[in-house]
Amino acid sequence: KDAEKMLLDRNLSLIAERYNIDKAQAQVTQARLFDNPVISLEQNVYNRLNGKYFDVGKEGEATAEIEQVINLAGQRNKRVRLEKGNKEIAEHQFEEVLRTLRSELNKTFVEICFSTRSIGIYDKEIESLSLLMKAFREQQNKGNISLLESSRLESLLLSLRKEKNEQENNLVNLRGELNLLLSLPAGQDIDLLLDDDILKQVDTAAVPFADMDNMLSVRPDLKMAHSNVTAAKANLKLQRSMAAPEFSIKGMYDRAGNFINNYFAVGVSVSVPIFNRNQGNIKSAKIDIMQNGKEEEYAIEKARMELYAAYNQLQKAVELYRSSNDELEHNFGRLIEGVNANFRKRNISMLEFIDYYQSYKETCLQLYELKKDVFLAMENLNTIVGQTVFNY
């Protein structure tokens, strides 16, 4: 939860995406504005009656005109509704980016925790084997241990160190991804805590598939697909209103150029929609509605398929985990000490010794993989549903 809060506050991609909502709100504000009036002024350059240039007196000719466009058929309100729909899409897009980043954060979190534990297994084996090697070198110098046996142990130790190095390189990459998500400086490691006891409480039967299918409606991408249809319908209404005639009123003053001096008049102008009735844009808007409708249907079907696969994946991961025995992890140190003691006493051969080391290591790593798979399956299901179904 702390990591998710840092993601909300610090992630640069999320902050950048949030600006799209502000931009969409600005477009709503813009759509509410009325058209500006147009003012025209005209002054005669040369008065032939008195020979004056730019005569601004009573005998000089000057005109002034003001014109205001008035939108008909509710064009302004329809444009506002369209921009509100676009803002809603921007909000859902932000939620979708957040859903994706949160999933990436949680999966990286789980990967780091289990990668760290895997390195701990290598550390224990390397530490134990290093102590054994020190004792063997002393015996080798006394001639009690053959060079072949010592070489086999050195080879095993080198192999473990190489595998550990690969795990550490992977951990560095995962830490880098986590720091990028949380906008932390490179190399800054934060402590991560993951409670395994939660795995014993996971019960898929408590949340039936049908219930989760009903939860899909809150998914941001599905809400965005629906908002696209709504915005397309709003656009069709706007385009139809744009087919209405353009109407404007104007007032005019003419000082000395009309049939009387100081002439005042008002007028109107109306476009005649004979040729252009916005047919092309109306048809395009209708097609856009059908297109977005099909895309919404596809998004819903895709979400249901993803949910079905994720639900089954979690069930299988939980079933496989519960069929395993995690006691080996807790008894790991005691088991290794027992193997070392038996090997020193020659109760087991070199091949058996190496096999025990490899088997214990592989079993512990596989157990971590089983646990990790359950956590990742829970996170995948949470992401697909669009809300937290399983807490951890």
Regions found by a protein language model. Give the residues of each.
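Acidic, low-complexity, intrinsically disordered peripheral segments
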Residues: 1-4, 186, 366-392
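Bacterial Sec-pathway N-terminal export signals of envelope proteins
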Residues: 1-38, 43, 69-70, 144-146, ...
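Periplasmic alpha-helical coiled-coil/stalk elements that build and connect Gram-negative outer-membrane
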Residues: 97-214, 310-313, 317, 360
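Amphipathic alpha-helical coiled-coil segments
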Residues: 16-31, 97, 101-122, 131-133, ...
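Short, charged, amphipathic alpha-helical segments
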Residues: 80-84, 147-156, 350-358
